Design a protein with these regions (language model features):
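Long, well-ordered core segments of solenoidal/helical folds
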Residues: 29-46, 85-103, 146-168, 198-216, ...
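A beta-strand-loop signature enriched in Asp, Gly, Thr, and Trp
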Residues: 105-119, 125-128, 133-183
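Terminal, non-catalytic domain-edge segments
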Residues: 72, 76, 116, 138-146, ...
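Carbohydrate-binding/catalytic loop surfaces
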Residues: 8-12, 45-65, 102-124, 175-189, ...
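Alpha-solenoid repeat junctions
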Residues: 11, 15-19, 67, 74, ...
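Acidic, glycine-rich loop-and-beta core segments that form the ion-binding/anion-interacting portion
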Residues: 65-124, 129
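Solenoidal tandem-repeat scaffolds enriched in leucines and small polar residues
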Residues: 1-84, 95
Length: 258
């Protein structure tokens, strides 16, 4: 059901195509995908995309991605069942928020135990505060009332964590510096935070300078091979740098098409 493999990703792509073409078939298909996504919501308010895992927080496989997709659907279909699913999804995800770390628990299993049980807090587009921040930025622009209040509160709680995670050992979009720093820039487009804007611009300049001096562009090889792909590899880094030159290019991490 998630953004990567399921209904949430389909909804965002289909509504994006509708906005580009005005072809109602895309919107009708998005509505059908949304009905299935709402029906699949678990009692805890999350979604179980993998039968071997519990409900997760986060953008790629967790509630942040599902709720963002439903908020995009709400733009075109003001249905109470969609609104209720969004509220429940936010409540579930925020039940995993830990104030001390200004981040959300990563409930995936690694070597037989949950990552969160060892106090490891992922900070990436895929899992953790950066992707959740991007989801909330989009939600506060699509929704109104109580949902916006929740989204803005989450944004304020997590922006510092996201910016502090922009100088790690990997530069990819999915779980690296270019992805996290680009999410901070999306925040700066919406919120008049001049201090964060200046810090973000400096971080991006430093990252691009380091990338230009590294033949691997800061990407660790997988099994001895260079990753050329978009989210995990060179293509995504190149696209993110292109967005510095052309501010009109869409944010692919939010599945924007324009």
């Amino acid at each position: 059901y998630d953004i990567m493999y399921g209904n949430a990703g389909a909804i965002l792509s289909l509504t994006g195509m509708y906005e580009l073409t005005s072809d109602k078939e895309y919107l009708d298909a998005a509505f059908r995908a949304g009905e299935l996504l709402v029906e699949a919501q678990k009692e805890d308010g999350g979604w179980q995309s993998n039968p071997d895992m519990c409900s997760l927080a986060g953008m790629s496989h967790g509630a942040a991605g599902m709720v963002y997709a439903l908020a995009k659907l709400w733009k075109y279909k003001r249905d109470d069942t969609i609104l209720y699913a969004i509220k429940r999804g936010l409540e579930f995800e925020n039940s995993l928020f830990v104030q001390e770390y200004a981040n959300w628990k990563d409930e995936r299993y690694y070597k037989g135990e949950k990552i969160s049980e060892s106090n490891n807090y992922t900070a990436a587009w895929c899992h953790g505060a950066p992707g959740i921040l991007l989801s909330r930025i989009r939600i506060q622009n699509l929704m109104d009332g109580e949902i916006v209040d929740i989204a803005v509160k989450d944004i304020k709680h997590s922006i510092a964590t996201v910016h502090d995670s922009c100088m790690g050992v990997n530069n990819c979009l999915c779980h690296g510096n270019m992805g996290n720093s680009e999410i901070v820039q999306e925040y700066c487009k919406v919120f008049p935070d001049q201090e964060m804007k200046a810090a973000s611009e400096l971080t991006r300049r430093n990252l691009i300078e380091k990338i230009s001096q590294d033949e691997n562009l800061g990407i660790k090889p997988f099994y001895g091979f260079q990753s050329l792909g978009f989210m995990n590899g060179l293509a995504g880094i190149g696209y993110s740098i292109m967005r510095e030159l052309d501010k009109e290019l869409p944010c692919i991490m939010a599945l924007d098409l324009r």
